[in-house]
């Protein structure tokens, strides 16, 4: 069997390398960079090698029949599409995440749910 490996940041992953642990943040930051930084710091403290966010375009990934359904959120009642927008990071927020992760030596990435999110 040939040796299979890839490089992520400064780390090699694959045959013969230590396990690569990813902390899933998803959208648990509630659209708040400071909360995201606290979660990243916790993942670093726990020994994670990387953290992963989720990125989606609400109009593409939220079924239209659910857009106007009101729900309880940490910010009170709002439509589902408004909630989906509130928890999404944009370029400005991801730039702050990138800067913070570089400062503490944490690899980060985001799984994109649609082409526009890429």
Question: Where do the protein language model's features map onto the residues?
Answer:
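Active-site beta->alpha loop and helix N-cap motifs at the rims of alpha/beta catalytic domains
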Residues: 74-118
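Glycine-rich, proline-tolerant flexible connector loops at the mouths of alpha/beta enzymes
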Residues: 49-88
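Conserved, mostly hydrophobic/aromatic
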Residues: 24, 43
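Hydrophobic faces of well-ordered beta-strands that scaffold small-molecule active sites
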Residues: 21-23, 51-53, 108-111
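N-terminal amphipathic alpha-helix/helix-capping segment at the start of soluble metabolic enzymes
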Residues: 1-22, 94
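Active-site beta-loop-alpha junctions enriched in small/polar residues
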Residues: 26-28, 56-58, 113-115
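Non-catalytic positions within long, well-ordered alpha-helices that form the structural scaffold/packing
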Residues: 44-45, 102
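A structural motif
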Residues: 47-48, 106
């Amino acid at each position: 069997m040939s040796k299979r490996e890839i490089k992520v940041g400064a780390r090699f992953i694959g045959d013969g390398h230590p396990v690569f642990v990813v902390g899933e943040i998803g959208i648990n930051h509630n659209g708040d960079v400071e909360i995201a930084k606290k979660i990243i710091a916790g993942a670093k403290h726990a020994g994670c090698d990387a953290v992963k966010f989720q990125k989606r375009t609400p109009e593409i990934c939220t079924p239209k029949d659910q857009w106007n359904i009101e729900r309880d959120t940490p910010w009170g009642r709002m439509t589902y599409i408004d909630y989906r927008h509130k928890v999404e990071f944009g370029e400005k927020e991801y730039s702050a995440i990138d800067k913070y992760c570089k400062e503490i030596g944490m690899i980060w990435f985001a799984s994109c749910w649609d082409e526009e999110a890429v």
